[in-house]
């Protein structure tokens, strides 16, 4: 991940081999091909995103502030490592990234719904939908930078929260 962050999203296996001082044949002892190596990078990035957003969500108090904290942690991660984020997006075969992050959002939303005594059946659909929304907005923000990260967090939270809160009066009161 460090090599991609330092050298950019267009990095190839030769670049990774040189930068990490590991001969290319050694990579192929562990990975069958370049795609498998890139998939592992995507998984590592997704696991980092999950860890960072989990820490931020756990530190927040109310459900709404947890939503904002999760969005902010996601945006902070891509802001600090834009080339790594672009690398993951550039390689469309890295579906695991979206799945790992989407399942994490599903778990968080499902927990909120169950705590409020609500049916959590919509959690997966909402989790993946919210991840897609935030990811699309993040892509645009990363390219345009027409507003601060805090403003993006506020706008996205304002857009998403009424849908989540409307599902439960207990959440809405938080």
PLM region descriptions:
Residues 3-4, 31, 38-49, 88, ...:
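Alpha-helical DNA-contacting segments of helix-turn-helix folds
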Residues 6-36, 40:
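Helix-turn-helix
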Residues 7-12, 34, 112-123, 166, ...:
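Short glycine/proline-centered loop/turn elements that form peptide/ligand docking sites
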Residues 12, 86-89, 150, 171-173:
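Short, hydrophobic secondary-structure boundary micro-motifs
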Residues 13, 35, 39, 64, ...:
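Short, structured helix-loop boundary elements
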Residues 40, 54-83, 130, 153:
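Hydrophobic alpha-helical connector segments
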Residues 54-55, 87-94:
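Short linear capping/connector segments at secondary-structure termini
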Residues 93-117, 122-139, 151-154, 158-162:
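Amphipathic alpha-helical packing segments from all-alpha helical-bundle domains
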């Amino acid at each position: 991940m460090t090599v991609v962050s330092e050298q950019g999203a267009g990095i190839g296996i030769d670049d990774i081999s040189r930068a990490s001082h590991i001969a290319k044949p050694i990579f192929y002892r562990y990975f069958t091909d370049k795609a498998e190596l890139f998939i592992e990078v995507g998984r590592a990035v997704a696991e980092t995103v999950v860890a960072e957003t989990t820490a931020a969500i756990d530190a927040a108090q109310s459900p709404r502030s947890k939503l904002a904290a999760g969005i902010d942690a996601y945006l902070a991660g891509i802001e600090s490592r834009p080339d790594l984020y672009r690398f993951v997006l550039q390689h469309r075969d890295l579906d695991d990234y979206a799945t790992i992050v989407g399942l994490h959002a599903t778990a968080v939303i499902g927990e909120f719904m169950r705590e409020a005594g609500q049916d959590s059946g919509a959690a997966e659909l909402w989790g993946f939908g919210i991840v897609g929304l935030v990811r699309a907005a993040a892509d645009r923000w990363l390219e345009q930078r027409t507003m601060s990260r805090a403003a993006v967090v506020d706008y996205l939270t304002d857009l998403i929260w009424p849908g989540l809160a409307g599902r439960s009066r207990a959440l809405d009161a938080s």
